Amino acid sequence: MRLHYLLFVFLILFLVPAPGDTFIPKSLRRFFCRVRGGRCAILNCLGKEEQIGRCSNRGQKCCRKKK
């Protein structure tokens, strides 16, 4: 039974996005952006937003309102 918990932890660690990782598919990047309270901006974030990540390798940025 403890093995299941260990495997679950490794699965979560594998799916959590790390800065600069390119092996994460674009759909997962968009999902994690929305989970963190952000949105995918095509070019730049708006003036009242901050960049918290990337939605794609081609320039889409994950932005959310500044706190």
Curated annotation (Swiss-Prot):
<comment type="function">
    <text>Has antibacterial activity.</text>
</comment>
<dbReference type="InterPro" id="IPR001855">
    <property type="entry name" value="Defensin_beta-like"/>
</dbReference>
<keyword id="KW-1015">Disulfide bond</keyword>
<dbReference type="GO" id="GO:0050830">
    <property type="term" value="P:defense response to Gram-positive bacterium"/>
</dbReference>
<dbReference type="GO" id="GO:0051873">
    <property type="term" value="P:killing by host of symbiont cells"/>
</dbReference>
<dbReference type="GO" id="GO:0060326">
    <property type="term" value="P:cell chemotaxis"/>
</dbReference>
<keyword id="KW-0964">Secreted</keyword>
<dbReference type="GO" id="GO:0042056">
    <property type="term" value="F:chemoattractant activity"/>
</dbReference>
<keyword id="KW-0211">Defensin</keyword>
<dbReference type="GO" id="GO:0005615">
    <property type="term" value="C:extracellular space"/>
</dbReference>
<feature type="signal peptide">
    <location>
        <begin position="1"/>
        <end position="22"/>
    </location>
</feature>
<keyword id="KW-0044">Antibiotic</keyword>
<keyword id="KW-0732">Signal</keyword>
<dbReference type="GO" id="GO:0050829">
    <property type="term" value="P:defense response to Gram-negative bacterium"/>
</dbReference>
<protein>
    <recommendedName>
        <fullName>Beta-defensin 14</fullName>
    </recommendedName>
</protein>
<keyword id="KW-0929">Antimicrobial</keyword>
<dbReference type="Pfam" id="PF00711">
    <property type="entry name" value="Defensin_beta"/>
</dbReference>
<feature type="disulfide bond">
    <location>
        <begin position="33"/>
        <end position="62"/>
    </location>
</feature>
<feature type="disulfide bond">
    <location>
        <begin position="40"/>
        <end position="55"/>
    </location>
</feature>
<comment type="similarity">
    <text>Belongs to the beta-defensin family.</text>
</comment>
<feature type="disulfide bond">
    <location>
        <begin position="45"/>
        <end position="63"/>
    </location>
</feature>
<dbReference type="GO" id="GO:0031731">
    <property type="term" value="F:CCR6 chemokine receptor binding"/>
</dbReference>
<dbReference type="GO" id="GO:0042742">
    <property type="term" value="P:defense response to bacterium"/>
</dbReference>
